[in-house]
Amino acid sequence: KYIDVQVTASAEDRAAIQQEVDEATAQLATTTDDYTSFIRSVGSEAPYVDLFYNKTAFPSDVVARLDSASVGSVYGPYYNGADNTINSFKVVAKTAAADSIEFRQIQVFAEDALKTKALADSIYTAIKGGANFADLAKKYGQTGETNWMSSAQYEGAQIDGDNLKFISAINNTGVNEVVNLPLGQANVILQVTNKKAVKDKYKVAVVKREVEFSKETYNRAYNDFSQFIAANPTAEKMIANAEEAGYKLLDRRDLYS
């Protein structure tokens, strides 16, 4: 047999997290930009990515309430028992956008940044002037073939930096438009060739905080259990007094299996 010691958040722990979410919710209402940094700063378990997502990409408790919130408004705070969290969210924006986008690209990289920019500008100008995209791609050792990107490929992933910049460019570029995109040490000449499956999409900033026990609550539980062990130094005494002390006694038949 063994004793399973469950440490749960105290009323004080929950009240402290509730207060933090209340404060974060008030700040969320007045925040107008850089939601990524703000959501990170309040310790949310749901990071904000500055892309339009399908409704289903957000936590299920947010999805269930999304239609009750208008763009620019804040919903919550509310408790969600399914994941033991206190939450609020803000619908930052809503749009109708393609869920699948076809594109092609030419990656441009030269000896240094100035030469890279000059070469990229030259290729971009040529394509805008009517040059064949695939022929130019082959000239620089690439195929220029088209690829499809769907939202399922990036929704729910950790996206930032150049990846965010690249995906944003694909989403924001019109069909047949060409973009000269600086990415790190290189440039990408990007052309969107097709878009399909238009759906409602959202940008939603979510404050999601688990109601977890504090260090003080854990230390209290540890000390209480240590005192119980000291007062019941034998297995017989522990078994006899565990339930009265509030501990659950369990069988461990598979301990040596």
What name fits each language-model region?
Residues 1, 67-100, 184:
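Acidic/polar surface patches and capping/hinge elements
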Residues 1-29, 41-61, 87-128, 142-165, ...:
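Well-structured core secondary-structure elements of compact alpha/beta domains
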Residues 26-36, 68-81, 117, 126-134, ...:
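Glycine-centered tight-turn and secondary-structure capping sites
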Residues 35-44, 133-142, 240-248:
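Short, well-ordered alpha-helical segments enriched in acidic and aromatic residues
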Residues 63-72, 161-170:
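Internal mixed beta-strand/loop scaffold within catalytic domains of large alpha/beta enzymes
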Residues 74, 139-142, 154, 182, ...:
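Intrinsically disordered, low-complexity segments enriched in small/polar residues
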Residues 178-180:
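Short, surface-exposed beta-strand/loop micro-motifs that present aromatic residues
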Residues 187:
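Active-site and NAD+-binding cores of ADP-ribose-processing enzymes
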